[in-house]
Curated annotation (Swiss-Prot):
Gene: lepA
Purpose: Required for accurate and efficient protein synthesis under certain stress conditions. May act as a fidelity factor of the translation reaction, by catalyzing a one-codon backward translocation of tRNAs on improperly translocated ribosomes. Back-translocation proceeds from a post-translocation (POST) complex to a pre-translocation (PRE) complex, thus giving elongation factor G a second chance to translocate the tRNAs correctly. Binds to ribosomes in a GTP-dependent manner.
Chief place where the protein resides: membrane
NCBIfam families: lepA, small_GTP
SMART domains: EFG_C
EC number: 3.6.5.n1
Keyword Manganese: no
Name this polypeptide is given: Elongation factor 4
GO cellular component, one term: plasma membrane
Keywords: Cell membrane, GTP-binding, Hydrolase, Membrane, Nucleotide-binding, Protein biosynthesis
GO molecular function annotations of the record: GTP binding; GTPase activity; ribosome binding; translation elongation factor activity
UniProt xrefs under PROSITE patterns: G_TR_1, G_TR_2
Protein's organism: Bacillus cereus (strain ATCC 10987 / NRS 248)
Reaction(s) this enzyme catalyzes, per UniProt: GTP + H2O = GDP + phosphate + H(+)
Enzyme class: hydrolase
Length: 607
C-alpha cells in the first residue's frame, strides 16, 4: 500500500474495548457485535466466543483480554475496520483491563439496566478516563422485567458525570440496539493518530507461546509499518528478531502482508526464549529504531504471595516451565524458587488477588497436569529491627526473632464497598471484624450506599470477599487500592506437630486475635491430620510461649485380646510393653500433613 491508501484506511479504523462490572453482559455484547458484522458464519458462532479458555467458559468470567478485527458497512455507505478488544471485569484482573485500554481510542461502558453502577464499573471507567478514551455508555438488559433504564441513565450522569442523554438502550441477549452501538462507534470514537512513515512503534499488549511458532506477540501499531521479513528490536530487552508472520484476528488468526498505524494484530518472529518479550514493551525496527519507547504500563505489584510446591518433587522443573509460560501470558504473575523443610522445593509466587491465585493454580493443574500443594497466602510486611535495619518479609517463616523486632508495618488498602441500604450494618460489622477503620459513607441514590474503609490487606486476602457476598446475599460489590504501610501489632505464630515446627503452617497474626486463632487452628488440625500409631501433640506457639494445644490420640491394638481372664500382672506386662513401643515410635516417627491442613490455616473464620 502507498502512503495515501494507508492514510485513507487509517481514517476508517476504530479501536474500542468494552468495559463493565462482572455479569453486566460484556461477553454477550461482544458476541452480538461479531454476529452483526458477519465475522463468523452461523455454524462457527458459540456463546462467549472470545472467552477461549475452558476455565473462562466454566466460571462464566473473562480472564484474558482478546482482540478481533471486524469489517462494518456503516449507514453512510463507507466500510469501517473495527478492532474490538475484550476485557475482564473482575478486580483481580484490572491489569488486563488497563492493557487493553492502552491499545484503544474508545470504550463502550456497559451498565446493567436493573443493577445500575457497581464498584467495578467505576474502577474501569476511571482507567478509561486516565487513558483519555471516548466513553460511550450503553444500558444493557433492558428486556429484564426489573429493568429501569431511566434511573440508570440518571445514575450514570450523577455518579460518573458522563452525558448519558444519547446512551444506547440495548439488550445483548435479544440483539436489540446493536446497530446503534456500531453507528455510535463509527461516529464518536476518533480514528487512530500516528504516521505510517515514522519509525516503527508497536505496543505489545499480550503474548502467548506456541510450541511451533515460538512467542506470538499481540500488538497495536502506533507509528510506522511492519512487514514480514523486517528485522525488529524489543526496546526493553534489546533483543533482535526477524519477523516471520504478521496478521490479525478475525477471531481466527489470519495472515497479512503488513500491519500499519492503528492495526491491532499479532506478530511472530520465532522468538524461542520466553524472557525476550515483555508485555508493555515497544517493538521497533532494528535499522531505523524509534527514539524512545511508548509509555508502557505501570508494572503492577503483586499483593498476595503463596508457595506452590509439586506433590511429586521430581516435577519441580516442569513446574518452573509451566510458570514461565503462564508468566508470558499473564505479566502480573511473579515467582522465585524457595525451599521448605516440610514440602521440599517449590516456588514463592506473587498474585494480584485470590481469584488470580486460584486461576493460576487451576491452569497449572489443567494445562500442565501438575498436582500442587499450596501454602497459606500472605502479604508483604516491612519489619524494622532494634539495630536500626529494616527488612521485607513475604513469607511468614522468614520473620526474625521477636526479641530483635522494633516494629512491624503491614500494607493497608482503601476499600470502596457499594451495597444496598438494608445491608449497611452487616457490611460495617464485617469491616470492623477485619480491623477496618471507617472513613466515609455516601448515598448514591435512595437505595444504595458507598462505604469507604481502610483495612489491612492481610485481612482481605483470606475470605473477605466471600463473607461480603454471603452476608449481603451477593449484592455488595467491592474495589480496593493500596494506600501504603502502617505499623500494627503483629506476631508470628508457629505450629508444632510432635514438637517439630512445620514451617509451611506458620502465619502472621494480629496480637489481639492470636489466642483465638491459635485455639481454632489446633482444633482444626486435630480433625484433619489422620491418627498415627502414637500420640501427636499439636501446639500453637508465639516465640517460645505455647498459646494453644491439642492432642491427636494414638490408634492402638487391643493387646489383651489373647488373655482370657488371667492375672492382672500378666495384662499389665503386655500393656507396658505396648506403651514402651509407642514411646519409641514417637521419638522417631514423623507426621504426614495432608493438603487440607495447609488450607485450614486460611479458612479460619468459617466457624
Amino acid at each position: 500500500m502507498n502512503k495515501e491508501e494507508r492514510a485513507k484506511r487509517q481514517s476508517k479504523i476504530r479501536n474500542f474495548s468494552i468495559i463493565a462490572h462482572i455479569d453486566h453482559g460484556k461477553s454477550t455484547l461482544a458476541d452480538r457485535i461479531l454476529e452483526k458484522t458477519n465475522a463468523l458464519t452461523q455454524r462457527e458462532m458459540k456463546a462467549q466466543l472470545l472467552d477461549s479458555m475452558d476455565l473462562e467458559r466454566e466460571r462464566g468470567i473473562t480472564i484474558k483480554l482478546n482482540a478481533v478485527q471486524l469489517n462494518y458497512k456503516a449507514k453512510d455507505g463507507e466500510e469501517y475496520i473495527l478492532h474490538l478488544i475484550d476485557t475482564p471485569g473482575h478486580v483481580d484482573f484490572t491489569y488486563e483491563v488497563s492493557r487493553s485500554l492502552a491499545a484503544c481510542e474508545g470504550a463502550i461502558l456497559v451498565v446493567d439496566a436493573a443493577q445500575g453502577i457497581e464498584a467495578q464499573t467505576l474502577a474501569n471507567v476511571y482507567l478509561a478516563l486516565d487513558n483519555n478514551l471516548e466513553i460511550l455508555p450503553v444500558i444493557n438488559k433492558i428486556d429484564l422485567p426489573s429493568a429501569d433504564p431511566e434511573r440508570v441513565r440518571q445514575e450514570v450522569e450523577d455518579v460518573i458525570g458522563l452525558d448519558a442523554s444519547e446512551a444506547v438502550l440495548a439488550s445483548a441477549k435479544a440483539g436489540i440496539g446493536i446497530e446503534e452501538i456500531l453507528e455510535q462507534i463509527v461516529e464518536k470514537v476518533p480514528a487512530p493518530t500516528g504516521d505510517s512513515e515514522e519509525p516503527l512503534q508497536c505496543m505489545i499488549f499480550d503474548s502467548l507461546y506456541d510450541p511451533y511458532r515460538g512467542v506470538i506477540a499481540y500488538i497495536r501499531v502506533v507509528n510506522g509499518t511492519v512487514k514480514v521479513g523486517d528485522k525488529v528490536r524489543m526496546m526493553a530487552t534489546g533483543k533482535e528478531f526477524e519477523v516471520t508472520e504478521v496478521g490479525v484476528f478475525t477471531p481466527k488468526t489470519t495472515q497479512r502482508d503488513e500491519l500499519t498505524v492503528g492495526d491491532v494484530g499479532f506478530l511472530a518472529a520465532s522468538i524461542k526464549n520466553v524472557g525476550d518479550t515483555r508485555v508493555g514493551d515497544t517493538i521497533t525496527h532494528a535499522k531505523r529504531p524509534a527514539a524512545e519507547p511508548l509509555p508502557g504500563y505501570r508494572k503492577l505489584n503483586p499483593m498476595v504471595f503463596c508457595g506452590l510446591y509439586p506433590i511429586d518433587s521430581a516435577r519441580y522443573n516442569d513446574l518452573r516451565d509451566a510458570l514461565e509460560k503462564l508468566e508470558l501470558n499473564d505479566s502480573a504473575l511473579e515467582f522465585e524458587p524457595e525451599t521448605s523443610q516440610a514440602l521440599g522445593f517449590g516456588f514463592r509466587c506473587g498474585f494480584l488477588g485470590l481469584l488470580h491465585m486460584e486461576i493460576i493454580q487451576e491452569r497449572i493443574e489443567r494445562e500442565f497436569k501438575i498436582d500442587l500443594i499450596t501454602t497459606a497466602p500472605s502479604v508483604i510486611y516491612k519489619v524494622f529491627l532494634t539495630n536500626g535495619e529494616d527488612m521485607i518479609v513475604d513469607n511468614p517463616s522468614n520473620m526474625p526473632d521477636p526479641q530483635t523486632i522494633d516494629r512491624v508495618e503491614e500494607p493497608f488498602v482503601k476499600a470502596a464497598i457499594m451495597v444496598p441500604n438494608d445491608y449497611v450494618g452487616a457490611v460495617m460489622e464485617i469491616c470492623q471484624g477485619k480491623r477496618g477503620t471507617f472513613i466515609d459513607m455516601q448515598y448514591l441514590d435512595e437505595t444504595r450506599v458507598t462505604l469507604t474503609y481502610e483495612i489491612p490487606l492481610s485481612e482481605i486476602v483470606y475470605d473477605f470477599f466471600d463473607q461480603l457476598k454471603s452476608n449481603t446475599k451477593g449484592y455488595a460489590s467491592f474495589d480496593y487500592e493500596l494506600i501504603g504501610y502502617k505499623p500494627s501489632k503483629l506476631v508470628k505464630m508457629d505450629i508444632l506437630l510432635n514438637s517439630e515446627q512445620v514451617d509451611a503452617l506458620s502465619f502472621i497474626v494480629h496480637r489481639d486475635s492470636a489466642y483465638d486463632r491459635g485455639k481454632v487452628i489446633v482444633e482444626k488440625l486435630k480433625e484433619l491430620i489422620p491418627r498415627q500409631q502414637f500420640e501427636v501433640p499439636i501446639q500453637a506457639t508465639i516465640g517460645n510461649k505455647v498459646v494453644a494445644r491439642s492432642t491427636i490420640k494414638a490408634m492402638r491394638k487391643n493387646v489383651l485380646a489373647k488373655c482370657y481372664g488371667g492375672d492382672i500382672s500378666r495384662k499389665r506386662k503386655l500393656l507396658d510393653k505396648q506403651k514402651e513401643g509407642k514411646k519409641r515410635m514417637k521419638s522417631v516417627g514423623s507426621v504426614e500433613v495432608p493438603q487440607e491442613a495447609f488450607m485450614a490455616v486460611l479458612k479460619m473464620d468459617d466457624n
